[in-house]
């Protein structure tokens, strides 16, 4: 059996990044050398100082985008499966609410509505989680240790849980304010949803329809 040819998509992306960054760095060095000279006219010095500032911002953005791409690629499959699971739970919760609304008591209806809201927040959390960060799972495969062996491990678990609660609280407010930048119903119907910004980092994202596509786009970055 012939050996499969490894994909060069990742390396090609890295090559483009390295090439673009190298050009920007060269321009920065050239301008810095020019500005070190004593005989540069004032107007030319001002123009080049402005250009230097703009180039440094461009380089910083490019470096951040590259870092974000690497993190997003690492966790996009986890996010995909968690999105599917969250949507499945939401479908079940809405179906249960419909059934209870027809035959149940008021307290049962109220409880079912709370479950639906909880599931909607889960869906929004997965979709809007900042791609520049290590993804914090809603449904981890293993239970966290109750008694971590080291102080560092304990602090790490506490930090992760604190960040999860912080992000989920922000998503909860968006859901309650009906301010989500996408339609949950569209996701439930298997439609592609274009999210221009996540709720924290401002990075552009494209969220694929979970029922129809498995590969999530990674070219949403600034």
Swiss-Prot record:
Task: Kindly report the protein's main subcellular placement as a broad class.
Answer: nucleus
Keyword set includes 4Fe-4S: no
Stretches of the chain forming a coiled coil according to its record: 47-108, 149-180
Q: Which InterPro entries match?
A: Efg1 (IPR019310), EFG1_rRNA-proc (IPR050786)
The segment annotated Disordered runs over: 140-166, 199-222
| Stored Pfam families | Efg1
Gene Ontology CC entries for this record: nucleolus; preribosome, small subunit precursor
Q: Which UniProt keywords apply?
A: Coiled coil, Nucleus, rRNA processing
Is Nucleus set as a keyword in this record? yes
Q: Where is the composition biased (Basic and acidic residues)?
A: 143-164, 199-215
* Compartments where located: Nucleus, Nucleolus
Q: Where is the signal peptide?
A: none
Per the UniProt entry, what is one GO biological process?
A: maturation of SSU-rRNA from tricistronic rRNA transcript (SSU-rRNA, 5.8S rRNA, LSU-rRNA)
Q: Its function?
A: Involved in rRNA processing.
Identify its protein family.
Belongs to the EFG1 family.
Q: Could you tell me what this protein is called? A: rRNA-processing protein EFG1
**What gene is it encoded by?**
EFG1
